[in-house]
Amino acid sequence: AFVKSGVRPRRTIVFAFWDGEELGLLGSRYFVNSHKDISQIKGYLNFDMVGGNNRPDDSQYFVYFYTESHPRIGEWLKDDIAHYQLDLHPNYKPWDNPVGGSDQSSFARHAIPIVWYHTDAQPHYNQPSDEASTINYPKLTDITRASFLTAWHMVNDATW
């Protein structure tokens, strides 16, 4: 989507996939502990089970954790949902100390602002039943759009 926009981002974007989360955040922890320019990382987006449903009464529900000391991250999502008419119902969770068992923790420990898209503990989490037929594709599509917009703000906002 960034390439298709025709606009070159102000900052570099790195897409990464980690391994060993359940074994102690091995991949993300190694990355942040060995990265020579860690202070240059302006933000981190993490996704856990974002196509899943944990609330039968609200199929567009998800949790949006973000670093509390960076309230613009929450404002960006609110504005983008309204402006682009995304069918999402986020539970905003500003977080003073965003650590925990997922990979955003490795970045938060280095004072890097994080966003963590999550659907709470849903029935298929880390189970053999976690398969394509359980994905809510419309929600996954809108979360993908929202995360693109959040990344767009992070890489193009001159004051970020």
Kindly label every feature range from the protein language model.
Residues A1-G24, S147:
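Alpha-helical metal-binding/catalytic segments enriched in His/Glu/Asp
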Residues A1-R10, H35-Q40, D157:
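Secondary-structure transition/capping motifs at alpha-helix termini
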Residues A1-S5, S34, D80, H110, ...:
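Generic, well-ordered alpha-helical scaffold segments in large soluble proteins
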Residues R8, Y30, Q40, S106, ...:
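Residue-level preference for alpha-helix termini and adjacent loops
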